[in-house]
Design a protein with these regions (language model features):
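Short, conserved catalytic or interaction motifs in soluble domains
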Residues: 169
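Short-chain dehydrogenase/reductase
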Residues: 156, 172-174
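Beta-rich strand-turn-strand
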Residues: 141-166
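Conserved hydrophobic/aromatic beta-strand scaffold that supports enzyme active sites
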Residues: 162-164, 172, 180
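Terminal amphipathic alpha-helical/low-complexity segments used for targeting or macromolecular assembly
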Residues: 1-60, 178-181
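Short secondary-structure boundary/capping segments
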Residues: 5-6, 53, 123, 130, ...
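Flexible, glycine/small-residue-enriched loop-and-beta-strand segment within the central core
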Residues: 40, 67-77, 82-150, 176-178, ...
């Protein structure tokens, strides 16, 4: 089973209908269900679920419900993290998030790419590319970050943006597709 996940992380095109994916997706969906059903007042329980779900998460973090991810183990988050409600991380490839990162509501980090050819897409052919987010980043609400994107340190991503390309450190970007507004 590890072999197919290693291949997926390496960026090769694979059969997304492979039963190994289905098992992991179902297990992760179960963990997300329990996280989302656990009240905010049960902080220790929520923390334990999150630590069991993610590959790594540092100290001082808040993940508001509802939250959703695909595998969980490909998510690596630093210290002092806030993930607001309706955060979705489609982590077929690694998602690395630095320290002091705030992500607004209704944001999606998507590592998965489906084939553009309908025949291949309908057969489940997919590829994944990692996402990297540096330290001290604020991603406002309703943002989509696409596969393979690297967001540099100190970046601010404006509300409603679709980030399709790498973002240089210490810049503000906004729009669809996201474009540099100014340096910080």
């Amino acid at each position: 089973m590890d072999d197919i996940f290693d291949q997926l992380r390496s960026g090769v095109w694979l059969d997304g209908f492979d039963p190994a994916f289905g098992e992991v997706l179902a297990e992760c969906a179960e963990k997300c269900f329990y996280l989302n059903a656990t009240p905010p007042s049960k902080k220790a329980e929520r923390e334990a679920i999150i630590r069991g779900l993610f590959g790594h998460i540092g100290s001082k973090f808040v993940v508001h419900s509802p939250f959703r991810c695909d595998f969980g183990f490909n998510i690596h988050i630093g210290d002092n993290f806030i993930g607001n409600f309706n955060l979705a991380i489609l982590d077929e490839a690694e998602v690395k998030i630095g320290d002091n990162v705030f992500i607004g509501p209704n944001t999606t980090l998507c590592t998965i790419i489906h084939a553009t050819d309908a025949t291949r897409r309908n057969a489940g052919i997919m590829q994944a590319k990692p996402i990297s987010i540096g330290d001290n980043v604020w991603i406002a609400s309703n943002v989509v970050v696409l596969p393979g994107v690297c967001i540099g340190e100190g970046v601010v991503v404006g509300a409603g943006s679709v980030v399709t390309k790498d973002v240089a450190p210490h810049t503000i970007v906004a729009g669809n597709p996201a474009k540099v507004i100014r340096k910080i």
